[in-house]
Each structure stands twice: as C-alpha cells, then as structure tokens.
Amino acid sequence: MKLYCLSGHPTLPCNILKFKSSTIMLDCGLDMTSTLSFLPLPLVHSTRLSKLPGWVTKDGNNQFEKELKECSGRVFVDSVPEFCLPETELIDLSTVDVILISNYHCMMALPYITERTGFTGTVYATEPTVQIGRLLMEELVNFIERVPKAQSATVWKHKDVQRLLPAPLKDAVEVFTWKKCYSMQEVNAALSKIQLVGYSQKIELFGVVQVTPLSSGYALGSSNWVIQSHYEKVSYVSGSSLLTTHPQPMDQTSLKNSDVLILTGLTQIPTANPDGMVGEFCSNLAMTIRSGGNVLVPCYPSGVIYDLLECLYQYIDSAGLSNVPFYFISPVANSSLEFSQIFAEWLCHNKQNKVYLPEPPFPHAELIQSNKLKHYPNIHGDFSNDFKQPCVVFTGHPTLRFGDVVHFMELWGKSSLNTVIFTEPDFSYLDALAPYQPLAMKCVYCPIDTRLNFIQVTKLLKEVQPLHVVCPEQYTQPPATQSHRSDLMIDCQPPPMSYHRAEVLTLPFKRRYEKIEIMPELAQSLVPFEMKPGVSLATVSAVLHSKDNKHVLQPPPKPVAPPGSKKRKRPAEESPETPPFKPLLSGSIPVEQFVQTLEKNGFSDVKIEDTAKGHIVHLQEAETLIQFEEDSTHIICEHDERLRVRLRDLVLKFLQKF
C-alpha cells in the first residue's frame, strides 16, 4: 500500500492511495497562496498601481522592470495571477481510477486534473460539495476573466533569474508548474464527471474496495472517507470539526478500528478560539461603524459567512446597528444564499427542525426580507444606486488580488476611519495587504477556523485508536514561530508517519488475508478433522479462479478419458494420473515423552539440548540428531536410511494426520 503526496499544503491536500490494485485520489486542493506574489487586478484603472516603479537589481540591471514592480519594499509580478497546482509528474494521473472529494475547498484543482491529464475515472462527492464548489470555481473564473491582462510574465521564473529576486519570490516553490486559471468550459466538463453520494452510502470500486463518505462536521456536505476491503480499513480524515455550527455533526464512530488513518486539514490557527474571534469581529465592526467608518470583510461566498451573518443578526439590534446596510457582493451571492436554505438534510439537527416549522434554517433570509442585507453580483448597476455609507461589505477574494475587494481596498484604504477585517485563515493578512501599502485604514485579524485543533485530534485518536496515523510533516513539529509549543503537534503512539510534497510513502501495513468463495460441490467433498474442541481442518484440492477481483475455489477438472481407438497409444499420450496427496501433519511433540519412547525402543544415551527455536535430541550412540522447532522437525543421520525411517515413524506417532 503506497501513498503519493502531490500537495505541500496541509489544509489543501491532494494525495493518491494505491490500495489493492486500485488508484484513489484523495482530494485535489488548489494552493492559492501563489497569487500573493502578484499585483492586484483592479476593476477600474488604478493610477497608484500603474505608477509603481519597475524592479531593478542591485547592479542596475533593469531587464525585469516590465514583469516585476516594487511597492513599499516588496516585489510583485505584474501579470495574470497563477496558481500552484498539485504535482503532476510524480505519478501518471491518467491511471487514477476515482477521486474522492472531502469538501468544496478541496476540489478547486479538479478541472486541472480531469481535463488536462487524460483522467477517465469517476469523481465522488456530496451534492452540497458539488454545488458550492461550482459557485467557488465560477466566482474565481469570473474574477480573473473580467479583468484581462495584456502581458504574461515568464522570465522571472527561470532559476538563474529567480535566485536574484528578493524574498518571498526567491523562495517560491515549483514556479514553473504555476498555471493560469481554468475556463468555465473546463469547470463544467470537470463537474460532469462527478457522481453524487450521500452520507454512509457504500460504493463498490471494481469489486476491490468499498468507499463510504461520513459527515465531517466542517461545512455543508463535507465528508471524511472510509476505504475498506474485507480485511483492511483506511480512514481519510480531512477538514473536520467538532464545534456546533451549521453542518451535520462529525461521525466519529465509523472511524474506529482503522488500520491506517490519514489525517489532513486541521485548523490553521491552533491558538485562536473561533467563538472569541467571532466576538472580536462583532465588536470591531461596531466600533468602526459608530466612528463613521466602513467595514470591509474579504471572504468566500460560502462557509464562515453564514455563521458571521447569523451572529450579526443576533448582535446588530443590541449594538445599535439596525440602520447600517450590509452588502454581500459576489457573482454567485444570490445562488449561495439560496443553496444554504435548501440543503436541509445536510444541516445540524436544530436547523433541520426549522424547515418543518416552517422557518428558514439561516436567519440571513430575514435580514434580506427586512432589507438589512442586500446582495449584488458586482459593484456596477444596482449596487451603485443603492450604495450608502457607513456600511459593511462582504466580498471576495480573501487574497485581495482579484474580485470586488480590490476596488474597496483602493476606495477606502486612504482613510483611518475604515477597517478591513480578515476572517478567512487561508492567507497571511500581512502578505495580502503588502501591495496596498502604505495603508491608512485599520486592519483587524480575526481568523475563524472551526477545524480540529491538536487537543481535539489527540482526543479523537485515543477514541478511534487507529493502528497507524499518517499526516503532513507540518503536524509533527511545533510551528516555526512557536517552537516551544510541543502541544501544537500531533501526539499519538506509535508516532505518526509524516509526508511532504512529491514524496511517496510505503504505508506500514501489509495485506494478510483475502476473501475466497468455495463452490458448493467442492464444499460437500470436504472432510473436516477436529484438531481440538471447536477447531476443525480439512485439506482442499481445487482450482483458484480469479476474475473482476473475485476469487472462487472450484473443483479440479477430472481427467478426460480418451475416445476409444484400436490404435495403441504411446505412453506419453496417456492421461497422467494425479499423485495421491501426502497427509498434512499437525500438533506438537512433548520432548520428554518422546525421549521415553526412544528408550523403550532400544535407544540409550539420549541427551536433550534447548535452543532458541526449540530442542535438539542427540542420540550419541547412533551419532544422530533430531531437531524439533515450532514448525518443522529434522532427523539428521548419515548413511543409515533404515534408522531414519524408524525414527520418523516414532515422531509420527505424536502427530495428527488429516
């Protein structure tokens, strides 16, 4: 069993498991941190960005100034943003049989995999994962395509050039594998390959293994996966949460008794309490509004935004914010808000009950009805007419490199009355803000990450007790900035196996058994022999027939009698007779009783010697040794076949035949 690691990002995994002649891809996350190396894509012409000076090397070389721009001491690529793909050279991706998706954040690289590698298999995911994943991809494509960039920078990627660049460009990994965004045509083609599944639904793969999605408690439709055969079980835990938010709670019971547990997608902010962060978010928002400023919340169009809107629904009246408009701007804003209300069966129990009252599961429906929350596809048209300040704007993208958020950063960045509040934990807020410096607006970092922390993981592993744990190397050591915090790493016994990008792990687990069916007519011919109370054995002479990964024992073919002929056949043409089977032996030989038997049969001067594997009986007079081991017996005597046979018969008296 082998695990191929194709991604270096622990919360955006992409691994391939080779298990019983099947090749299974576990997620295909897209690392978007690469876009932080690029300049933002403004919706309207930005004089500030267009006047940034080109980067010049220390020796005055200005050949890169068209591709690289400098802003407040940082160097950025002036080109269409590119994304860091999973490894494509480590294994032939056209050999992948199936792709299992755990949540909508972990499927953003799907079009690259399914449309550009020769992949012909099937993708499995839950319906909310597919629908919300579609929205995220659609939004991403829209953000990139609506601001076309004339030039495409490539010179800076050459190794001899990259090493001259300042950090972080100098340290960027696998820059030649970075790719521009896919098209909507590729998105639709990729999604057409997905087969929808429900929680606890068992899916057979080629008769080899069975895969089952389980609720992971993190997002709408998010799943952990159990991959098992008749005698082996692998659990894949990715992006899970034990907190009570809007999704169904995590199914932990089904993860028990795993031979291998692959663990990814833990919280990226292990020291931050999500409830505390939500409280901070609300108080900073209220403080800014009261002082006459605007609040900008860079966010994804699904996920944490539902919980933030629910908290604000309960908070705005008590905080005196009932007259403040809330704007949600995204090309998919309307679809996202509607989807959240119709996926009732994927919600936690309390929200499911509201559907039958009937009430909307999420309170943002009431915010929309009361005109406190308004949603728009973009900043043009209706939004321009309705726009009032001070206000709160939820919009994307959290990288601050593309989307409507770029416009608001340029619009509000010059005033210290305004505040940008970062709630998404996927990106460094300092790196996100770098191309907007110097910045007058206030910045607040309230990362809300409900995924498992290390304390919860340690408790979970003690409860489900897998034989082996496999995880990214980042989880086996404390963070570099907090090297003294040994509690910020996975603690389990035996210690977890770790992996990094482009590594192949041989998992410490060997297949020991295989299920085989036996034909009824063959079963009838068996004669069991009782070895001890409750245990019987029988010898089987059969033909093993394997097809479609099913194994069947069939009776051996009977020799075909040759057709009658007067012509005498040569001996070579006659059907060979099957030699009789030698009986199988079982049991153990009590050495002291065996020595007594030897003495009764005329052998004297017998000595016994203990060894690491058993005993040696030495017949000194006959110059013969008899070695007794757990699974074998050897009689060593030179040039006396009659003596050997005589001793063999004495040994056989102590063993059972069947």
Curated annotation (Swiss-Prot):
Its main location: nucleus. A motif (Nuclear localization signal) lies at residues 566-570. It comes from the Eukaryota. Keywords: Cytoplasm, Nucleus. Disulfide bonds: none annotated. GO terms for cellular component: cytoplasm; INTAC complex; integrator complex; nucleus. It is found in: Nucleus; Cytoplasm. PANTHER family: INTEGRATOR COMPLEX SUBUNIT 9. Although strongly related to RNA-specific endonuclease proteins, it lacks the HXHXDH motif that binds zinc and participates in the catalytic center. Its function as endonuclease is therefore unsure. Component of the integrator complex, a multiprotein complex that terminates RNA polymerase II (Pol II) transcription in the promoter-proximal region of genes. Component of the Integrator complex, composed of core subunits INTS1, INTS2, INTS3, INTS4, INTS5, INTS6, INTS7, INTS8, INTS9/RC74, INTS10, INTS11/CPSF3L, INTS12, INTS13, INTS14 and INTS15. The core complex associates with protein phosphatase 2A subunits PPP2CA and PPP2R1A, to form the Integrator-PP2A (INTAC) complex. INTS9 is part of the RNA endonuclease subcomplex, composed of INTS4, INTS9, INTS11 and inositol hexakisphosphate (InsP6). This is Integrator complex subunit 9. The lineage of its organism: Eukaryota, Metazoa, Chordata, Craniata, Vertebrata. The gene is ints9.
